[in-house]
């Protein structure tokens, strides 16, 4: 899949999710973009919304978070605190372009999509909490841009519906990210095999949106077929934000990128042919050698022929065929046996 100038068929697409890790500072946001590029990220992703894009400014119990990292916080207040203001976007997209890192966003309502159009984004991201809103999904599909969908809380029925909508809107560029919508995510709750299931069941590009500590999960995800990795990024450990508890700092993110690149390199092309480097070591494979002096006319037997390393003699597959045949010449102990040595 082509996302901007990036081809996911050739390389795993690594996204640094900024989210709330600007900690309310535009300067921090711009520094984070530059740092993400240096850490090896292919793209920086932001979130485009106002609190009104997401919820109602209500004090009713329905709108108070219960449990988890944001326990007892009011939804409206949480989103007000975590948002990336509209007025920052121009500088964010400009900085990303200047730094040579791709930039796109997760919108959450029609007005967010309309606002983002002015930046001609390379892609859109749909958060899993919006994946059940068919009208919103269709709005994004109509944009005809590559679209990445986190599947965290989405049901199979909803995911099939998303595929149907994108097909109807003639938008083939759809990515499903395996995602566990708990913050942070315990490693035993990751269910990474779901990456394989998403690929097989929905026939779309797949990846991982990771909220766990460390970067074991992204590396494993690549081995399971992930072509997109999204991980929350922060400038350093001094950042305190709504997402900092499950984010990687510069050094950690760089280490993750290096590990992911090593993992995809280690996967290879799946072909079973021996490459040139391995073929050189074929010299240490077994072959047939004289384990004793053998006189001309003497029969080959288990007593005077042995399959040993290295491989300059006959292939061991000729061992049984050779037994009982007569030597056509004198053969010394340690001589490699050849086709012309028997009659």
Swiss-Prot record:
Disulfide bonds: none annotated. Pfam families: NeuB, SAF. Its EC number is 2.5.1.97. It is an enzyme of class 2 (transferase). One of its GO terms (molecular function) is metal ion binding. It comes from the Bacteria. Signal peptide: none annotated. Its cofactor is a divalent metal cation. Keywords: Metal-binding, Transferase. Optimum pH is 7.0. GO terms for biological process: carbohydrate biosynthetic process; glycosylation. Residues 287-343 form the AFP-like domain. Catalyzes the fifth step in the biosynthesis of pseudaminic acid, a sialic-acid-like sugar that is used to modify flagellin. Catalyzes the condensation of phosphoenolpyruvate with 2,4-diacetamido-2,4,6-trideoxy-beta-l-altropyranose, forming pseudaminic acid. This is Pseudaminic acid synthase. The lineage of its organism: Bacteria, Pseudomonadati, Campylobacterota, Epsilonproteobacteria, Campylobacterales.
